[in-house]
Amino acid sequence: MPLDFPGTPAGYSVLSELSDATYLAEAIVFISTHPTARNAAFNVTNGDSFRWSRVWPLLAQWFEMPCGVPRPMKLAKWMEDKGPVWDKIVARHGLEWRSLETIASWEFADFVFEKEWDLLTDVGRLRRAGFNACVDTIAMLHSQLENYRDARLLPLARSHPSSGRLLGSRLCWMVRASRSSSSI
C-alpha cells in the first residue's frame, strides 16, 4: 500500500516551513530573556524551507512503503473512527498505548497539508536580535520518527535489525541536524 500525500497536488509542490518544538522553546526563552528582543514580535521557524514532493518520498522510505501520490483528504474526518484500528496496531506490536487523538493533531495536519501557496517566513528580525540557531527540517522529521520508534509509539520496520517482525528505518538519511548553539 503506498503512502499517499493527504493534500492537493499544489500543496505537494509549494515551499513549506515547519518549527521544531525544542527549537521553538529555545527561541521563546531567548526572546523573553534578552534585551535585544524586548517588546518585539518574532517569526520562529526552523530557518529552512522544503517541498513535500521532496520530503514525502523520504517519509515513505522510512516507513518502508512505496511513495504514493497527492490524494486530498481531511485527516481530521478520516481518522475519526480509526481508534480501534490503532489499538490493534499497538497490541500487535507491543507499543506504548496512546490514544490516536493524542498522537497527532489531525486538524493541524490538515492545515499543513492543504496549504497551496509558498510559505517563506522572515526570521531576519530574530537573527538580528541575536538568536541564530536553526534546525534542518528533514533531519528533524527523521529524528522525531526515530524518537517515536525508540519510545515504542511507532512500530519498528520489518527490516530493522532489532526485530524480525516490527516497523523502523533502514533509510540512510544524508542530512544531519544543523543546529547551531545560541547563547540562551
Region roles according to the model:
Residues 1-19, 43:
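A conserved pocket-lining segment of Rossmann-fold NAD(P)-dependent short-chain dehydrogenase/reductase
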Residues 9, 128-132:
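Aromatic-glycine-rich donor-binding/catalytic loop that engages nucleotide-sugar donors
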Residues 180-183:
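Short, intrinsically disordered C-terminal tails of secreted or membrane-associated proteins
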Residues 24-109, 114, 122-124, 128, ...:
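Mid/C-terminal beta-alpha module of Rossmann-like enzyme folds, strongest
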Residues 131-140:
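Short, well-structured beta-strand/strand-turn elements
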